Amino acid sequence: FEIPSFDLTELYKETELSNEDLSGNFLINVWASWCITCRVEHGFLEKLSKNGVRIVGLNYKDDRSDAIDWLKKYRDPYELVIHDFDGSLALDMGVTGAPETFLISNGKVIAHYRGEVNQMIWEDVFIRVIKDSEIIL
């Protein structure tokens, strides 16, 4: 499916964002400061980001200041963070909780995983699809 249309704000600057601001190949990671499993997977996301994987954060049903403080404490692996304060975009994407991760290629979801992404999941779910689709992150 395609990324649903949305009009939300960027977490830090509070500038308006829409699906038109997202292009190319990247991950969308659904996370929240209140999510314990998000903290568990965070180190792996940092590793991916340092290796050049583009990651957009979708901050899910979270208080803006709590989310910013959380990223300051644990570091920010995201190229961009969408503040989905009421969960509307997540709902439109079929999200049932956090964390969830989507692989996006040119506006379309080509892989999706519910739960913690770690090295094993990265290889089994995402790398396989990346190789099969011949996309470059």
Regions found by a protein language model. Name each.
Residues 5, 24, 52, 78-79:
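A generic structural signal for alpha->beta connector loops
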Residues 27-28, 55, 101:
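Hydrophobic beta-strand anchors of alpha/beta hydrolase catalytic cores
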Residues 1, 133-137:
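Non-globular targeting/processing and membrane-anchoring segments
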Residues 9, 36, 46, 110:
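Nucleotide phosphate-binding site architecture
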Residues 39-75, 85-92:
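Structural microenvironment flanking redox-active thiols in thiol-disulfide oxidoreductases
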Residues 73-77, 84-130:
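Thiol/disulfide oxidoreductase modules built on the thioredoxin-like
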Residues 1-19:
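N-terminal "domain-start" segment that seeds a small globular fold
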